Amino acid sequence: MVFTPARPALASIEQSPGTPTAVVVHGSRYVRLGELAPALPTDLTVLLRQWDRYAADVEAIVGSMNTVRRIASNGVSTDYGVFGAPVRDTSTYCAIGNYRGQLMQAALDTSTDTPPDAVRRRVTADLEMRRASGAPFIALTGSARARGTSTPIALDDDALTLDWEAELAVIIGRRAWQLPRERAMSVVAGYSIANDLTLRGAVFRDDVPALGGDWLASKARPGSLPLGPLFVPATRATNPDDLAIQLKLNGEIMQSDRTSDMLFGVVDIISHISQLTPLLPGDVVCTGSPAGFGSHYGRYLRPHDEMEIGIEGLGSQRTRVASARNRSN
């Protein structure tokens, strides 16, 4: 599967700590956005939060063959870029239990006293009912989660059950409040790759087991959402509800599916969230993750693990796990 975008995409690099710079990437090279369009913001987060104002300019740049030629002749190798998240310090919404295969896998893993065929029939019926009359299950997590992909993930001493979740991330470009389904895509700026890192052991609490999942404790730690490196404008992406998605751990495929396995698609998720709270430019919506969590394999992230996520047309994300946060690597 070829994950690389056919056309240029945007990204954010840090030429020095704390100084994000928007760049245009094509293949394995990039140029600074300011070299192509000096009037545009040099910070990709600022640009995305004013997407209505700059969308047409961005479209002209990423759609131009002149951009491709400029990057080919004058671009810098991506090997020399420290990539930050395309957008930072923003609300992050996460769809929970949104892939049919993952829900089936979880049910089979935990229903050891029931024949597998009976489990499959029950789960299939439940999913059909939920799709027909239910709604996406959304968790609002921390605003400091988004992190770049170049810096290793520091593994806290208590993060013994840190799990991976490869996800299609939708980045909002316009304010959305109580949108009908037919208008949902009009507020999408574009797409990126997310790894919705989750402390699996913190999801359910022993002190209040009846209250359900504690998504703040399990998902909200700063830097727990590797995002990017690429941002692909919606006009340059193919159908978000039918993209190949894959995660490798140390070269071994752990997750592999298509976004068509989502129970609720991008339109459903955006419209649903907007009925409950306004979505704002720069907000990140993670759309769920396919089967193949570490909890299924009985194996969580360890120091020096390497993850690679690919989503069709959105590129690849590579991240490495360091050791404890108070150690260098």
Annotate each PLM feature.
Residues 88, 94, 280, 302-303:
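Residue-level recognition of short, solvent-exposed, well-ordered loop/turn junctions
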Residues 161, 278, 300-301:
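Residue-level "contact hotspot" at macromolecular interaction interfaces
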Residues 147-149, 279-296, 309-312:
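Conserved metal-binding segment of the jelly-roll/cupin
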Residues 21-62:
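N-terminal cap/recognition module
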Residues 229, 253-279, 294:
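Glycine-rich active-site loops that engage anionic ligands at enzyme catalytic sites
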Residues 2-13, 45-249:
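Active-site microenvironments in enzyme catalytic cores
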Residues 2-37, 222, 229, 291-329:
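Charged, cofactor-coupling segments
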